[in-house]
Structures are given as structure tokens and as C-alpha cells.
């Protein structure tokens, strides 16, 4: 007896990834949220074009921030590192839920157990909006 395989489409989303180098912490946060908003638009549009059976969307590396270019650890943490339960993850979770997709990407992230440091974290958000892999 053969097991039925479920088929799905995956999208490797390519988009302009703005850098936040040279921006203030506040302007960096605003830039990151605008980028997430654009991602929502592109995911929705891509699903309309390539099919509703798109179930996995993979975002580019450094999609929200670029990478540090001379900033100190403290400066980059303030500018680029997001909170585990912060606005950026909430917005990404909404995209996954609204489009019924697994959303995969990476981000610089703060961890309360390691104050003053940031981590480059890969994540997967499920269609229910839950971060299922970090």
C-alpha cells in the first residue's frame, strides 16, 4: 500500500532588502515594519498568481535590516534586534495567518537571558501564527 503524498507549493520570496545602517533606532524600527508590510503585500499577491496551494514562504537572509557595518554590539542590538514577543514577530505572524502559510526567515533577536547581546535567529511561523521553530 502506498502512502498518499500531499503536494504544496513553496515560494522563495525575492525582494529589495533595505539596510538600516546609518539610521537611528527609531527610524530602523519604522523601516523594519515597512519591510514587513511589503512582505505581506508580496505574499498575498504571489499566492494569487502561483496558487492557493502555496504553503511555504521563505524570506531572504537579512530581509529586515541588512547586516552590521561597523556598529557596536550595543548599537546593533538597539537598531536591529527584535523582541521574541515584539511587534515585528506579531506582524509576521499575521502574514502567516492571513495567507495560511508557513513563513520562514531570520532576524536579529534579543534574549532576556543574555542582556546586551543579540542572536541571528532562523524561525518558522506556522499558519496559526505560532513560532514553531527558533
Model-derived features: where do they sit?
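Hydrophobic structural segments
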Residues: 1-134
Amino acid at each position: 500500500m502506498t502512502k498518499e503524498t500531499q503536494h504544496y507549493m513553496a515560494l522563495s520570496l525575492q525582494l529589495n532588502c533595505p539596510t538600516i545602517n546609518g539610521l537611528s533606532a527609531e527610524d530602523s524600527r519604522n523601516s523594519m515594519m515597512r519591510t514587513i508590510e511589503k512582505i505581506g503585500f508580496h505574499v498575498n499577491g504571489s499566492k494569487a498568481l502561483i496558487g492557493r496551494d502555496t504553503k511555504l514562504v521563505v524570506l531572504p537572509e537579512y530581509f529586515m535590516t541588512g547586516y552590521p557595518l561597523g556598529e557596536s554590539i550595543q548599537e546593533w542590538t538597539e537598531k536591529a534586534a527584535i523582541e521574541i514577543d515584539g511587534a515585528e514577530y506579531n506582524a509576521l505572524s499575521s502574514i502567516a495567518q492571513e495567507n495560511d502559510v508557513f513563513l520562514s526567515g531570520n532576524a536579529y533577536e534579543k534574549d532576556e537571558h543574555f542582556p546586551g547581546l543579540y542572536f541571528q535567529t532562523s524561525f518558522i511561523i506556522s499558519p496559526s501564527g505560532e513560532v514553531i521553530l527558533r
